[in-house]
C-alpha cells in the first residue's frame, strides 16, 4: 500500500537551493564539539551496540543522528523522510528522541513508529520514498545494552562504506559537504506498523492458513509483543503467548531466542504443534518442535530451502550462511543437490553475498533468516509464519521433518567475557592464543573446524569447535577457552 505511505509535503530540502544549503550554522556544533570515542570502529556486525551510559549516550545518539542524516542526504537522489523505531528497553525512548533530534538538525523529516520490530523499519523504508531507516535496539542483548541500526533506502543494512562516512563525521575527519538552512520535522506515524503486519500475511493468505495449529510464541518482553500474536491469530492459529508485554527491565532476560527452555516446556505442556522464540527486536527467531526439541537456524534454512527447491524457487539450489553453519547441515544439503556459500558472521554479510550471487535464501544458525522472495532483510515474524505454514502443508509434525533432515556434527560454542574493547577486538595479536588455534587445527585436520572471533554485538570472544565426535570437541574447546581466559581476560 505504497500510496498511503507517501511523504508529507513541504519538508525542507525539496528544492535544489535548499539542498545546497545543507548544514548551515551547525557545522561547528556537530563537527568540532566531539565526544570521546573508542579507538576501534563504532559499527560492528549489526550497527553500533554497547552499554548505555558507557558507549551509548544521548549525546552520541544526537551526533549519530546528525551524521546519518548528512550521509543519507548526500547519497540520496531525492530528499525523503527517515523512518525511526525502537524496542522496549528503558533507554530506547531517550536514544530515539536524541537520534531524531540529530536527523531533524540535518534537515530531514522523521517518521517515528514507536515500538516495532526491526524488519518493520526495513520493509517500510523499502516501499516508501524514505531515504533510510534507523532502529534503536540491541537485539538479543540484555536490558542494560542498546544499539543503533541504520538501513539504506532499499531497506537493507547500510553498506559499510556509508557506515564509515558516518563514523568519519563523528570523529571530526570530515565536514558536511552541504549545509542545512532549515530543520526537519518529527512526525508520529504509529499507524504504519499495521502495513507491515498486512505484508507478513499477504503471501500466505491466498494459499494457506494456520487453522488447526496450536502455536506458542515467546515475545521476550520486546518489540514483537502485540503484533506477533495478532498476526498468527488472524492466520487462524490458536496462540499461546509468553513474555508478551513491553518490559524494558526484562527484555531478553531468561527468555526469547537465547533461552528456549521455558518455550520448550510450554509446547510440551500444551501439546502444541510448534513454538517460536524471538529476540528483543524480532529480527531473528528459533523454533521448538512438538517434542520440545530446539530447532536452530541451520534446520530452518534446510527445511525452507528444500521446500523452495521442490517448488523451483531456489536459483542454483543456493543457500548462503556463515562460518557458523554446522558441517552436518552442509553435507546433507549437498547430498540433495544443494550449494552452500559461507560468509563471515553477521546478517549484513549474508545479505551482501545473496545480492552478489542472486541467492534467494540465507541466514545464520542463530536465527537471522532472509528469504528475498518476501523480504529485504532478516525477519523473525515472517520466518516463523512460513515455517508454520510449511509444517501445515507437509501434513506431518516438525519433529518428523527435522528427523528426516540431517544429523549435526558435535559443536560447542563458548563465550569468554572480555570487557576491554581494544583487547577484545585485537585478540588476533595474542600469540599464545594463535598458537593454540594452530595446534588444534593441525590435530583435527579435516575432521573438524575451529572458529575464534570477537563478537560484534557483545563484550565476548566466541570460541566454536566442531568435530566428528564429542570427545574431540570437548577437549579442544576447553583448551582454547583456557588460553583465551589466561591471556585476554581482564
Curated annotation (Swiss-Prot):
Highest taxon listed in the record's lineage: Bacteria
Biological processes annotated in GO: carbohydrate metabolic process; peptidoglycan biosynthetic process; UDP-N-acetylglucosamine biosynthetic process
Active-site residue list: 139 (phosphoserine intermediate)
Alphabetical keyword list: Isomerase, Magnesium, Metal-binding, Phosphoprotein
Cofactor dependence: Mg(2+)
EC number per UniProt: 5.4.2.10
Binding sites annotated in the UniProt record for Mg(2+): 139, 279, 281, 283
Residue positions where Phosphoserine is found in the record: 139
Major enzyme class: isomerase
Cofactor-binding details, from the entry: Binds 1 Mg(2+) ion per subunit.
Gene Ontology molecular function terms on file: magnesium ion binding; phosphoglucosamine mutase activity; phosphomannomutase activity
Substrates-to-products reaction catalysed: alpha-D-glucosamine 1-phosphate = D-glucosamine 6-phosphate
Keyword Isomerase among record annotations: yes
PTM per Swiss-Prot/TrEMBL: Activated by phosphorylation.
Membrane-spanning ranges: none
Protein family: Belongs to the phosphohexose mutase family.
Role, per record: Catalyzes the conversion of glucosamine-6-phosphate to glucosamine-1-phosphate.
NCBIfam families per record: glmM
Protein name per its UniProtKB record: Phosphoglucosamine mutase
Species, as recorded: Nostoc punctiforme (strain ATCC 29133 / PCC 73102)
Source lineage: Bacteria, Bacillati, Cyanobacteriota, Cyanophyceae, Nostocales
